[in-house]
From Swiss-Prot:
Pathway the protein acts in: Carbohydrate degradation; glycolysis; D-glyceraldehyde 3-phosphate and glycerone phosphate from D-glucose: step 3/4
Biological function: Regulatory subunit of pyrophosphate--fructose 6-phosphate 1-phosphotransferase.
Keywords carried by this UniProt record: Allosteric enzyme, Cytoplasm, Glycolysis, Kinase, Magnesium, Metal-binding, Transferase
Organism: Arabidopsis thaliana (Mouse-ear cress)
Gene3D superfamilies, A to Z: 3.40.50.450, Phosphofructokinase domain, Phosphofructokinase, domain 3
Oligomer status and interactors: Tetramer of two alpha (regulatory) and two beta (catalytic) chains.
Cellular localisation: Cytoplasm
Induction record: By sucrose, glucose, and fructose.
Protein name: Pyrophosphate--fructose 6-phosphate 1-phosphotransferase subunit alpha 1
Keyword Phosphoprotein annotated: no
Description of the deletion phenotype: Retarded growth and reduced pyrophosphate--fructose 6-phosphate 1-phosphotransferase (PFP) activity.
Database matches in SUPFAM superfamilies: Phosphofructokinase
Regulation: Allosterically activated by fructose 2,6-bisphosphate.
Gene behind this protein: PFP-ALPHA1
GO CC terms in record: cytoplasm; nucleus
Amino acid sequence: MDSDFGIPRELSPLQQLRSQYKPELPPCLQGTTVRVELGDGTTVAEAADSHTMARAFPHTLGQPLAHFLRETAQVPDAHIITELPSVRVGIVFCGRQAPGGHNVIWGLFEALKVHNAKSTLLGFLGGSEGLFAQKTLEITDDILQTYKNQGGYDLLGRTKDQIKTTEQVNAALKACTDLKLDGLVIIGGVISNTDAAHLAEFFAAAKCSTKVVGVPVTTNGDLKNQFVEANVGFDTICKVNSQLISNACTDALSAEKYYYFIRLMGRKHSHVALECTLQSHPNMVILGEEVAASKLTIFDIAKQICDAVQARAVEDKNHGVILIPEGLIVSIPEVYALLKEIHGLLRQGVSADKISTQLSPWSSALFEFLPPFIKKQLLLHPESDDSAQLSQIETEKLLAYLVETEMNKRLKEGTYKGKKFNAICHFFGYQARGSLPSKFDCDYAYVLGHICYHILAAGLNGYMATVTNLKSPVNKWKCGATPITAMMTVKHWSQDASYTLTSIGRPAIHPAMVDLKGKAYDLLRQNAQKFLMEDLYRNPGPLQYDGPGADAKAVSLCVEDQDYMGRIKKLQEYLDQVRTIVKPGCSQDVLKAALSVMASVTDVLTTISSNGGQ
């Protein structure tokens, strides 16, 4: 019911305490002046996509990075915006809820009112459907009171549908025009921010004055690139999951007779599973990216687990905890091929009960082998973005079933001499994504909300609010905005076996995989054998808001060497210094030295670029 949105919440004592917490702002966002420096124009993420991207985004491709600066910054090219008229801004939750989302609204609202008290913030009720239907709620400080630093998306509600069809895009344009919006802020993950980029281009082509801004909010942690270090919600969901996992570890160690198979929400890629492993130290984690890279079959994975169970039994350890990302199932080559066939037949209108008779021989053989509960789940209709309904596919139960079958066989044959194998299965996701947000997510979301205002005040369209150097304290965060087109790529795939016919996908932000050459994965690999055999279980405990642990951040964030925006800014400063020193009239020695150094730098950068930046 629309009337339920925005009503005051009943708050527990802890929630009341959290609602009084005021997140800190970095120095560049403090005060009442907007100072923005626009850098060089951005390039496409993949050179091969240049032509397709140029055709898709003639108005918004190649826009510059924006850096927001503190009021006292001595930057001659910075644009200082002092005239800040009242504006009307719409904001909408798209995609699944993530802890901290409400603080984006709070941060934007505060920035609007600080710079001009007459500005208006309208929340669209029920996500994108509310946008199309122009169902709005005017955000006020009274309405926000019981939603500050709180979880969920229940202030406005949400949808997970895309803004993609011609009808939907036109409805969004009409809503923004009818409501006289100066800006539209879209909160979501890779799909929602892809839609934001296309919407910004459509608005620009239609000469609509509404500027579109995206905000990286998703528990999956897969909206990652050089510009985006973390997503709002990821920190919280990993900390909550890690406590639950650690509790299971303690239980397993106490009873010494159960293996816990725990599947973690996180869509196709394994960022949540990797981070939770680094925080809680379970015995095993099966990352989808490892499986895909090694082309492991479902039977290979089951054998890996069985061998681990047998090795632990030799050490008189008949218990353990195994983490499984929900996207593992689509990383297994033969299962992925089966799902593609099933989805193709469903799109053709074939009923679920007749699909098994129309599968190819290989897929049919696999399908018939699978237990009935998995068959039923694989036959579910795909999501709106054509992906499988991963949260509904109980991969943990499938693996537990296969492992139990094999261990019983080994027990009978005498090759396994441990206790009878007992599995307990769990799926963690819904329990965590509605949690109170962590201190980090509260701060990060609030800052992103403020940045959204600065983007709109600077008149920028098709940008994402970004913060880098996140592993440092808030006062060292670098705030800016990146054209969403700079994060987008185009998928190409073959339509036939000869590879002569290829299809080109819609330009999109594609989910980032776990980097198997990254420092977070390397940390896992260094410790994997110890985690497997030594029961080094670690319990981080519940979310902390004060004292030890309150300022802890994701391990995968802290081990990486990032701050791309800060380094781009530093490079720009060096180049400016070079231009100041080396100009007509400088000495021959200065000119020769500059040429020599620049030639060497160019050679090194050309070599690195040709190797794909590795």
